[in-house]
Amino acid sequence: MNLLYPFIISFSMIFFAELGDKTQLLVLSFSTKNKAYKILLGVALGTFFSHGLAILFGSKLASFSHISFQFYLKLFTYFSFILFGIIGFLPEKPNTNTTKKPSFFSRFSHLHLGAIGMIAISIIVGELGDKTFLASLGLGLEYPLYKFSLICGSIAGMVLSNLLAIFCGK
């Protein structure tokens, strides 16, 4: 298997899983105040760390040689990916709590990270446990020898899908 096949699989899986996701809404909100290149760099950097972690973790789990363990782990990963997709369509309950909590961004404002750093941190935190994160974990399980191609495909899929959100925000 050449390096292009895992790249294409990773790109297409992440791209389509990201469409309409909360990360796109986050990027849409960033696009009102930041330049597109800063947002895309932040998305690429955040994706590198979050999805890279998922792919590396998945490929490490794939190194366990017990076949039934791998089967159930893949089954759990793909089932949870589908479950997260279904949960995304369910309506949320309205929040009746009126107390104001400090925003996520105000906690990091003293670090002076700049726009790219704030976007990257937002993407990292937003993607942990997300369906695209689980998809990356599953890709790492399925193709443990092609980590570089999977990470590059994941970054390309996230950047391209969020580029659509930037165009909508401008």
Give short role names for the model-derived ranges:
Residues 13, 73-76, 110:
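Physicochemical signature of membrane-embedded alpha-helices that form the seven-helix bundle of GPCRs
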Residues 21, 82, 130:
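Residue-level signature of catalytic and energy-coupling elements of molecular machines
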Residues 35-104, 164-170:
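Membrane helix-loop-helix hairpins that form the core translocation module of multi-pass transporters
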Residues 13-17, 47, 80-88, 122-126, ...:
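Alpha-helical transmembrane segments of multi-pass membrane proteins
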Residues 2-69, 134-157:
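Juxtamembrane transmembrane-helix termini in multi-pass membrane transport proteins
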Residues 90-91, 98-133, 139:
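Selected transmembrane alpha-helices and immediately adjacent juxtamembrane segments
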